[in-house]
Amino acid sequence: MCSIGEDDFGDEGAAHAMVVEALPLGIVLSPGNCSKCDVNSGELYKLNFRAAECRECFLTYARHKFRAALGAAKILPRNAEVLLVLDGSAKSLVLLDMLHFAQTQNQFKRLHCNARVVYVEEQQVQDRDPVDLEALLSLSVQYAPFDFYVIELGQGCSLQRIKDYSPSLKANNELIHKLQKLQSLTARQDYLQQQRKNLICSVAQSLQCTHVFEPNISVDLATQLLTAIALGRGASAALDVALLDDRLSGDVKLLRPLKDLSEQEIQFYIHAQRLKPLFQSGSHYGMERGPTASLQNLTSAFVANLQHNYASTVSTVFRTGDKIAVNSDPEQATCVHCQSALDSELSDTLLAIEYSRSVSEAGVSLYKNGQDLESLAKKRLEMQDGLCHACRAIQAELESGNLL
C-alpha cells in the first residue's frame, strides 16, 4: 500500500504557513467543475487548502487517508481478526463505512481482514435515553456481512448479538455506583475512559480479535495528548495518539486509522454518503456541564478553539505526540489499571503533591505529633500499589472500595 504524501494527503501538508484562501469553505451547492477530474458537478466540496472537488474525488481522497494510514506502517497482517468500535457518532460511522467499502473492493484493492462490529452502549451511564434499536439494526443490515454485537458499559458480561440484545436494568450497573463515589468530574471522566478501554479489550479477547479499530480523529488525539500530560501520564502520552497502541492485555493491538482526518472531512463524508449518526458530537459523559467542569472539558474546549481559529495548529499538536519517544523497555512496570508506564524514580513534583496531601490530612494534629511528613510522603510514593500517579489520584477520591 502507499503512504500519505505531505503535499496531497497530509492534514495541511506543507501549508502550515499559508494564508487561508478567500474561497468559501464547505459544500458548494451551485454547479461547477471539479479541480481534479474536470467533470461538471452539482455539488462541490471545498476543504481547507484544497481546491473544490466533486463527491467522487473527495471520497477517493478521504478513503485514501484511511488506507494509507494502515498501509504506511504495515501493521495490519493479512486476514487479521478486527473488532471495530461503534459508538453512534459521526466519526465511528465514517470508519464503519470506510472499512466496509475497503472490504467490498476487487481482490487487488480489497483490505484483507475479518471484521466484527461492537456497539458500546453508554447511554445508561450518561443518564440518557437508550439507543434507537431500529436504527442500529438497520446499520447491521446495511453493512452486512459484518457481525454486529452490543455490550453495555458497566455490564461486563452483557455481550450479545444485536438481534438478541435487550437493555438491562440501570440499577444493576456497577459502574454507575462507582462513578457516584468519585468526587470530581475529572476523576469520573478519566475512570470511565479507562474502564471503556478495558471493556473493549475484553470483548476483543472473547471474540478472538487481535486488532481493534477505534474512530479517533486528529482533534481527538490532540485533546488526548494534552489531557494525558495534564493528568500525569506524560510518560505514555505518545501511545495515546499513536496509530498503534499495544498496551492492551492479551496481545490485543489498538489502531486509530482515522488519525489523519479532520472534523471537517468527517462532516463532508457524512454528507457525501448520506449517513445518519445515532448521536451528535460532543455527547460524551460530563460534557454538558460546561468547559470548566473538568480538566478534560477545559482541554477539549481549548483544542476546539484552536481548531476553529488556527486549524493547522491542532495537526501540529497531535503530530508532536508522534515524535515523543516511547519507553520500550520490556521490564518497565505498568499501571494495573490504565497500563501506562510507572515512574521508576521518585519525582520532586510527585513528592511535593504527596507532601501537600499529607499536610492536608494531618490537619491540626500536625502540631501535636510532629511526624516527619516528608518521610511519610516518600513512603506513600514507594508503596507498590501498582498504580500510576493519575490512577492514584482517582483512588484517593474514592469514598470507599478499590479502583479495580
Swiss-Prot record:
Pfam families: CTU2 (PF10288). SUPFAM superfamilies: Adenine nucleotide alpha hydrolases-like. Plays a central role in 2-thiolation of mcm(5)S(2)U at tRNA wobble positions of tRNA(Lys), tRNA(Glu) and tRNA(Gln). May act by forming a heterodimer with NCS6/CTU1 that ligates sulfur from thiocarboxylated URM1 onto the uridine of tRNAs at wobble position. GO terms for molecular function: nucleotidyltransferase activity; sulfurtransferase activity; tRNA binding. Belongs to the CTU2/NCS2 family. One of its GO terms (cellular component) is cytosol. It is found in: Cytoplasm. This is Cytoplasmic tRNA 2-thiolation protein 2. InterPro entries: CTU2, Rossmann-like_a/b/a_fold. The keyword Nucleus does not apply.
